Amino acid sequence: MNATSSTPGAGAERLEQDWRTFARLLGQAYDDELHVPLLQLMLTPDEREALATRIRIIQALLAGDVSQRELKNELGTGIATITRGSNSLKSAPPELKRWLIQQLRDTPL
């Protein structure tokens, strides 16, 4: 048994700490212009593709001009993937949604 499984909540706390460490490291990598090699190191090609798909899903949902089913067909992904993106977007803070709209508005789908 590992240390995180013997203490309820400890695993979740560690996961959150590790996530924040990654976010801080990524921010520093951007400052140092090392973000692309860092992301290539940290993410497999499939994970990078999944992130790119999630961005396209969020962009299309924010634009609101296609249904989830149409988006599924356009992206060639499962409806569950579209639904997860939609649910994440629904729970995002309003300021993040505004920022995303501004950042993604001129990016082609």
Swiss-Prot record:
Functionally, this protein is described as follows: This protein is an aporepressor. When complexed with L-tryptophan it binds the operator region of the trp operon (5'-ACTAGT-'3') and prevents the initiation of transcription. The complex also regulates trp repressor biosynthesis by binding to its regulatory region.
Q: Which UniProt keywords apply?
A: Cytoplasm, DNA-binding, Repressor, Transcription, Transcription regulation
Q: Which family does it belong to?
A: Belongs to the TrpR family.
Q: Which GO terms describe its molecular function?
A: DNA-binding transcription factor activity; sequence-specific DNA binding
Biological process per Gene Ontology, one example term: negative regulation of DNA-templated transcription
Q: Give the quaternary structure.
A: Homodimer.
Where is it localised?
Cytoplasm
Q: What Gene Ontology cellular component terms go with this record?
A: cytoplasm
Q: Which residues bind DNA?
A: 68-91
Give the highest taxon in the source lineage: Bacteria
| Name of the protein | Trp operon repressor
Output the InterPro entries linked to this UniProt entry.
Trp_repress (IPR000831), Trp_repress_bac (IPR013335), Trp_repressor/repl_initiator (IPR010921), TrpR-like_sf (IPR038116)
